[in-house]
């Protein structure tokens, strides 16, 4: 399904630019080129967002693979044509084939170069952060682990370029078997009604789990707890039908994806981690 990416800049604050993204698969040349770039993190124009201060701290703590710096959206519009740079930025993404106006906030790592449209810039990684209307406190506490994942992903595809496909994240489902030795942290509000209690979960999931708070997940990430994996759920929080609900299980220490899937939200499959997702984890 082809996503549409929108990005806002100072030059176009009163309008949005629609960008029809292709399902681009980075080549071996793209991957090699990335490691020669300086990575520029695009800061948000909205002074009310905490993203800017958080991402600065995260990059200082996590980013090791390239030199990095920070730029404004206006500078991004100028520098994105230069191949000596790569960029970390957030965008608004929708999926034309889904036939819904649902929009999501994605975090991208893309290469600069002579690309007229933003969607033509080669994506090294694109991760769903949140449904676009969700407050940033729903994802900000997970930014460190997601940036850590992006960095690790670049190293993985450098070492194993053969895994790079349109659905590259499906590769991480090979890690599902390792979940049985860890404790799965989940938020109650991110569980579907069929599995929203300890008793219901135990009927379908035999491994260790805990229904926790955001603070518990943030603490596990900060401590790099090797015994914890946690659910990163991206959905419209019950406000949309036919929208996508992404469910990703991430290691608090290694930032590895242990499970990656999404479903279309219906009455039968609501916005949340489903009974079928738990069953997928024990296959």
Language-model regions, residue ranges each:
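Amphipathic beta-strand/beta-sheet edge segments enriched in Tyr/Trp
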Residues: 91-149, 218-283
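Flexible, glycine-rich surface segments
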Residues: 158-242
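Helix N-cap / beta->alpha transition motif
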Residues: 71-73, 213, 251
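A charged, solvent-exposed segment within the mature domains of Sec-exported extracytoplasmic proteins
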Residues: 117-182, 190
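Start-of-domain marker
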Residues: 22-106, 116
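Bacterial Sec-dependent N-terminal signal peptides
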Residues: 1-27
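Extended intrinsically disordered, low-complexity coil regions enriched in Ser, Thr, Gly, Ala
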Residues: 51-65, 195-205, 260
């Amino acid at each position: 399904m082809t996503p549409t990416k929108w990005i806002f800049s100072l030059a176009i604050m009163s309008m949005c630019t629609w960008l029809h993204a292709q399902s681009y698969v980075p080549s071996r040349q793209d991957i090699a080129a990335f490691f020669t770039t300086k990575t520029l993190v695009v800061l948000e124009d909205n002074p009310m967002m905490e993203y800017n201060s958080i991402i600065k701290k995260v990059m200082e703590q996590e980013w090791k693979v390239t030199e990095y710096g920070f730029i404004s959206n206006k500078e991004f519009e100028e520098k994105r044509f230069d191949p000596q740079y790569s960029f970390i930025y957030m965008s608004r993404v929708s999926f034309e084939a889904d036939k819904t106006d649902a929009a999501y906030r994605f975090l991208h790592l893309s290469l600069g170069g002579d690309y007229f449209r933003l969607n033509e810039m080669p994506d090294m990684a694109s991760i769903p952060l949140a449904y676009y209307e969700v407050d940033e406190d729903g994802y900000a506490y997970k930014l460190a682990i997601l940036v850590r994942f992006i960095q690790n992903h670049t190293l993985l595809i450098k070492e194993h370029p053969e895994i790079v496909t349109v659905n590259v994240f499906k590769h991480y489902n090979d890690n599902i078997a390792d979940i049985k030795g860890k404790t799965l942290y989940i938020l109650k509000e991110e569980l579907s009604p069929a599995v929203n209690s300890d008793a219901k979960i135990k009927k379908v999931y035999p491994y260790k789990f805990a229904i926790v708070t955001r603070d518990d997940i943030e603490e596990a990430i900060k401590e790099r707890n090797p015994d914890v994996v946690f659910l990163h759920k991206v959905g419209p929080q019950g406000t949309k039908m036919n929208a996508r609900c992404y469910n990703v299980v991430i290691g608090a220490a290694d930032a590895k994806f242990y499970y990656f899937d999404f479903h279309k939200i219906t009455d039968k499959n609501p916005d949340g981690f489903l009974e079928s997702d738990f069953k997928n984890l024990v296959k």
